[in-house]
């Protein structure tokens, strides 16, 4: 949770709101305080209460920016409804508010209109008051970075003037990591750690930096520094679990994944159930694996996506037929912008000898996710051939038939 939500100030605001809900209080809360309460409920997995708080705020303060932004983002990310998000955004009275600009850009980005979003934000730059322009530049760079649009993020950040600012260096480190410059990112992070060795954020980002380079033991060490500062730091627990998983220490990885689940909530709590199940399956503990697969599906708000993650695990553990059934049933049900699992599905078809289906899914995989396609299928084609060329080439003949392992459930 954000440090603000742990503060006494916020706890006091939350208490006042809860008393209002019980009709025991008569305190005044402004629209931004109510929006913060909605955000808190959202982060703690209480979606119904989150919507109720934001809706109450809009009823009391019609057209207020903060609660309408919250409801619009809920429509966008939870309901997957950009039209509803746009309608809520249009209710905002102050359409010169920076948060309104950011919201409209996010709606565009969620519809894969990245260049349109950049153009929109650029066009509004000259409308920003001179003393707010640098903040605007930084916010836009951060926004693009959050969406993984690192080239656009770097373009905006290059216009930021205070290159010695802590916030600038933090964002620069993230962008460098995203663009594959992990050594440079590490240099910036070490500089930040020297300035504040008690920041769990910096240690966690250093752990991620080592992780992407495959330096798993170094990643574990960085995570342990963060955990020494805060034994319940969510990112540190997750980073250490992931690194332990990557070096094959399944039992310890499960221990840290479960510790992570105890201190987090909502979707973030649930997604590691698949990973725990995967470890148990790899250890041939099928009943335990089934238990965690079931948990993951039951607690998922997007069951098709969870089934696809389950299929990837099954495939990796040799249950090719079971994985194939899940891929074929669920990839046709996901949203248009979903891009994970198609190359895995194609590989399943190949291993099962379903070459007509392989060729059909291969074309979809290439359109959806070139990186995944190369990772999963490159060994079937001549070295240095590009994924876009795969449909024109003949894959290497299978050396043997996929095993017929199936799960007893």
Describe the residue ranges of each PLM region.
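Register position in tetratricopeptide repeats
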Residues: 43, 77-78, 110, 143-146, ...
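Canonical positions in the second alpha-helix
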Residues: 57, 89-92, 124, 159-160, ...
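TPR-repeat structural position
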Residues: 10, 47, 81-82, 114, ...
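Start-of-helix register in tetratricopeptide repeats
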Residues: 32, 66-67, 99, 133-135, ...
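Structural marker of alpha-solenoid helical repeat scaffolds
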Residues: 60, 91-95, 127-129, 162-163, ...
């Amino acid at each position: 949770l954000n440090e603000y939500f742990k503060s006494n100030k916020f706890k006091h605001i939350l208490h006042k709101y809860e008393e209002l809900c019980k009709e025991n209080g008569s305190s005044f809360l402004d629209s931004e305080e109510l929006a913060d309460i909605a955000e808190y409920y959202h982060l703690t997995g209480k979606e119904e209460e989150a919507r109720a708080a934001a809706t109450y705020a809009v009823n009391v303060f019609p057209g207020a920016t903060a609660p309408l932004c919250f409801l619009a983002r809920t429509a966008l990310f939870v309901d997957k409804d950009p039209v509803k998000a746009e309608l809520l955004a249009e209710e905002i009275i102050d359409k010169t508010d920076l948060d309104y600009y950011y919201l409209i850009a996010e709606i565009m980005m969620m519809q894969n209109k990245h260049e349109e979003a950049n153009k929109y934000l650029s066009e509004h730059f000259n409308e920003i008051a001179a003393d707010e322009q640098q903040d605007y530049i930084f916010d836009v760079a951060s926004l693009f970075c959050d969406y993984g649009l690192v080239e656009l993020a770097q373009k905006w950040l290059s216009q930021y003037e205070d290159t010695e600012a802590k916030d600038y260096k933090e964002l620069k480190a993230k962008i460098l990591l995203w663009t594959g410059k992990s050594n440079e990112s590490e240099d910036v992070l070490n500089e930040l750690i020297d300035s504040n060795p008690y920041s769990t954020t910096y240690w966690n980002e250093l752990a991620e930096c080592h992780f992407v380079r495959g330096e798993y033991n170094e990643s574990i060490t960085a995570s342990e520094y963060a955990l020494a500062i805060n034994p319940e730091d969510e990112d540190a627990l997750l980073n250490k679990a992931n690194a332990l998983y990557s070096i094959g220490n399944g039992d310890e990885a499960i221990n840290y994944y479960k510790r992570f689940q105890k201190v987090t909530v909502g979707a973030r709590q649930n997604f590691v159930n698949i990973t725990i199940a995967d470890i148990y399956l790899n250890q041939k503990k099928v009943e335990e694996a089934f238990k965690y697969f079931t948990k993951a599906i039951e607690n998922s708000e997007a069951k098709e996506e969870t089934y696809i993650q389950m299929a990837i695990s099954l495939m990796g553990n040799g249950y090719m037929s079971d994985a194939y059934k899940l891929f074929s049933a669920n990839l046709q049900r996901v949203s248009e912008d979903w891009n994970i699992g198609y190359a895995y599905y194609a590989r399943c078809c190949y291993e099962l000898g379903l070459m007509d289906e392989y060729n059909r899914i291969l074309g979809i995989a290439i359109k959806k996710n070139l990186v995944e396609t190369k990772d999963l299928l490159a060994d079937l084609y001549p070295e240095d051939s590009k994924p876009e060329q795969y449909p024109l080439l003949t894959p290497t003949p299978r050396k043997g038939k996929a095993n017929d392992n199936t799960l007893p459930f």
